[in-house]
């Protein structure tokens, strides 16, 4: 039982770490001479421009930013609630509240990654002056980490739903 508990805790912390890196790091769209994410666009590693309301379709970028931040916060809250429930639940009860919050984090990261997947090309085309040198890029590791975090949070949310408290 102790090994299972340790695995669940490590799995959850890994999910939170993946979400943090995917949200913070500047590598959602990368190329040889540039990298761009949901916060800024950098060309030649020196010329960085923050994304602000002057960017067309900034509301789309803000939706991705907000849902990634929300997913990270929800994942951390789910972990704290899990620890609280670990000591408060009666024997045999399920970690339903933790599961619901973790699945909400999963939903948020899925929404963010899906919006970015769908709208990235439109944002780049509508803001040619900002994204002029980013046409030859590909999805970066932060984008991939967001999808991996989606899978991790989904699995952990299901794990919490199935899990019952034992002695």
UniProtKB/Swiss-Prot annotation:
Provide the protein's localization. Answer: Golgi apparatus membrane; Cell membrane; Apical cell membrane; Membrane raft
Q: Which Gene3D superfamilies match?
A: 1.20.140.150
State whether keyword Plastid applies. Answer: no
Disulfides per UniProt: none
Q: What is its main location?
A: Golgi
**An example Gene Ontology biological process:** positive regulation of integrin-mediated signaling pathway
UniProtKB keywords = Cell membrane, Cytoplasm, Glycoprotein, Golgi apparatus, Membrane, Nucleus, Transmembrane, Transmembrane helix
One GO cellular component assignment for this chain's record is: cell surface
The highest taxon in the source lineage is Eukaryota
Sites where a glycan is attached: 44, 47, 52
Q: Provide the topology term for how it sits in the membrane.
A: Multi-pass membrane protein
Q: Where are the transmembrane segments?
A: 1-21, 67-87, 95-115, 143-163
Say what the protein does. Answer: Functions as a key regulator of cell membrane composition by regulating protein surface expression. Also, plays a role in regulation of processes including cell migration, cell proliferation, cell contraction and cell adhesion. Regulates transepithelial migration of neutrophils into the alveolar lumen, potentially via mediation of cell surface expression of adhesion markers and lipid raft formation. Negatively regulates caveolae formation by reducing CAV1 expression and CAV1 amount by increasing lysosomal degradation.
The UniProt subunit note reads as follows: Interacts with PTK2; regulates PTK2 activation and localization. Interacts with ITGB3; regulates the levels of the heterodimer ITGA5-ITGB3 integrin surface expression. Interacts with P2RX7 (via C-terminus). Interacts with ITGB1; the interaction may be direct or indirect and ITGB1 has a heterodimer form.
Give the UniProt family note.
Belongs to the PMP-22/EMP/MP20 family.
**Protein name as it appears in the record:** Epithelial membrane protein 2
Provide the species name: Bos taurus (Bovine)
Q: Coding gene? A: EMP2
């Amino acid at each position: 039982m102790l090994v299972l508990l340790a695995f669940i805790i490590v799995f959850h912390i890994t999910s939170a770490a993946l979400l943090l890196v995917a949200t913070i790091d500047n590598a959602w769209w990368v190329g040889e001479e540039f990298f761009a994410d949901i916060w800024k666009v950098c060309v030649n590693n020196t010329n960085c421009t923050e994304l602000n309301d002057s960017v067309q379709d900034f509301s789309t970028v803000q939706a991705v930013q907000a849902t990634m931040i929300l997913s990270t916060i929800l994942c951390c809250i789910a972990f704290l609630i899990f620890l609280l429930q670990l000591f408060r639940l009666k024997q045999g009860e399920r970690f339903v509240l933790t599961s619901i919050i973790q699945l909400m984090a999963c939903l948020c990261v899925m929404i963010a990654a899906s919006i970015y997947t769908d709208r990235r090309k439109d944002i780049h085309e509508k803001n040619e002056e900002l994204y002029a040198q980013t046409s030859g890029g590909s999805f970066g590791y932060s984008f991939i980490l967001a999808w991996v975090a989606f899978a991790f949070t989904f699995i952990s949310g299901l794990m919490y739903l199935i899990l019952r408290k034992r002695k």
